[in-house]
Amino acid sequence: MLLGSHVSMKGKEMLLGSAQQAAEFGANTFMIYTGAPQNTRRKPIEELNIPAAQALIAAKNLGPIVVHAPYIVNLGNTVKPENFKFAIEFLQQEVIRAEALGASQIVLHPGAHVGAGADAGIKQIIKGLNEILRPDQTAQIALETMAGKGTEVGRRFEEIAQMIDGVTLNDKLSVTFDTCHTSDAGYNIREDFDGVLNEFDHIIGLDRLKVIHLNDSKNPQGAHKDRHANIGFGEIGFDALHGVVTHPQLVDVPKIMETPYVGKDKKHNFAPYAYEIAMLKKGEFDPDLLTKIEQNEGRL
């Protein structure tokens, strides 16, 4: 199974540190932001420590590598033209960075219409993607299924399909399926994942599904909240999420966790991923998992 998590990329180690962290978690794939997800400040490509990282990635047989674009980039904005222009320019450079890092997929929250309406937002996203995509690019932009919080677009499979259909170079587009977002959007991941997957296949096509964000949800189906929970400790539950990980139609799709750190406060919290990966590989829910993570400071 292709199973991993978000890992950090920072300091002097950069991508090498990301690969080391993924290996320590017991992962065989991983996702990174090219800088802080809350801003768009980025280091030059030559400072990302790529050659040293590539050697470790090959030695540990890690991959595919997934890049996540920052949250604050909004291609759906028709209200502020300067924000839309900035989003295009940033994402053009993000594609170049992702390719240099060896990433095959760039996860992108499609955008929010900020009050102009979903149709206007979708048209603007299509316009932006048509400016960003290059015929020769190797990394795909993987539009993420959204929870429908606020004015987000992409909460329904039909909206994602509309974006893809409107883009000229849509062979450069794929989809990230987030289990928390999709449940929060109203799809029954907990009890009928096969049915949801069949609907996705009918509307978008399974050949477009290139990344899965494997997250439990703190809120019930249809809540439109987007609050991730640790695997098995939310409203979707362990059995359903383990079923996603082991699904025969999704063997070659990387499953990436973005579950919350565990601890009493922000100064004393620990990455859950080594434990969650081990639990999913074992196939048995551990109700004491969060206590163990905190007691052992995230180390197995």
Curated annotation (Swiss-Prot):
NCBIfam families: nfo, PRK01060.1-1
Family classification: Belongs to the AP endonuclease 2 family.
Catalysed transformations (reactions): Endonucleolytic cleavage to 5'-phosphooligonucleotide end-products
Amino-acid positions noted as binding Zn(2+) 3 in the UniProt annotation, renumbered to this chain: H181, D226, H228
Encoding gene per record: nfo
Protein name per UniProt: Probable endonuclease 4
Entry-linked PROSITE patterns: AP_NUCLEASE_F2_2, AP_NUCLEASE_F2_3, AP_NUCLEASE_F2_4
Binding note for cofactor: Binds 3 Zn(2+) ions.
Annotated Zn(2+) 2 binding sites: E144, D178, H213, E258
HAMAP family: Nfo
Cofactors (names): Zn(2+)
Role this protein plays: Endonuclease IV plays a role in DNA repair. It cleaves phosphodiester bonds at apurinic or apyrimidinic (AP) sites, generating a 3'-hydroxyl group and a 5'-terminal sugar phosphate.
Coiled coil: none
